[in-house]
Amino acid sequence: MGRRMVFPKSTPLSMSSRRRPGFTLIELLTAIAIIGVLAAALFPAIGGIRKRARQSSAQTAFSQWASALARYKQTYGFYPNIGSTYSTTTDTLHDLGDAAVNGRFVRALSGRQPTGSALSVADRRALNRNAEEFVAFGRDDFEDPANFSDASRLVDRFGNRRIRVIFDTDNNTSIRNINPPGGAASLPGELGNMATAAGLPARIIIYTTDLGDDFESFDGLGASDFAQVFAIQ
């Protein structure tokens, strides 16, 4: 007799073994909701980190400018006369929100125009007779870098053009009785005493603020887009 071939019986796949693993609609919606909650919590934190980084960068720039002003005084014996008058009996606040003052500040400290061209004879005589470079301004120090020109204005890293520069022009190592354009309430808390007779020990102060509507940008930003930045020398 011939041998019989025996084949194993095939077992039909169960419905459960053919089903692919996956998420139900409820599980997907739950995951999306969790991601949304996490994103809502993270975005403000990320925004805060970025703002603090810009604040730090702005403070570094202001500190460099203040050091440049100190070197200017060491070189010439006085602070740059960037305003309409120069008083030696009181301390002096200069508003770089004024385009003319802003321009004189740049030319006095850099020894040139914003674009790098040479100072006129009149500017050298009035602002920096040796055309010495006390600080090198970069394009990121000015507003609207895409349209950079000799008329461009310095701003802080938030685009605030209302930069206040204060000199101890009475040479008593204290800045006092300052009347800020935005009022005393606009001052960062650490600078409050400079608006009083008690004063603040300093020779140079540079600051911007987000208080008292004492801020301005060429693109019309609001208070939440600015920050308090200052440097004391």
Tell where the protein language model's regions lie, with residue ranges.
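Small/flexible residues
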Residues: 5-6, 21-22, 52, 126, ...
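Generic hydrophobic-segment detector
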Residues: 12, 23-29, 67, 149
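N-terminal pilin/flagellin-like segments and related low-complexity appendage regions
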Residues: 55-233
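N-terminal single-pass transmembrane signal-anchor helix
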Residues: 19-49, 54, 58
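N-terminal leader/signal peptides at the extreme start of proteins
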Residues: 1-23
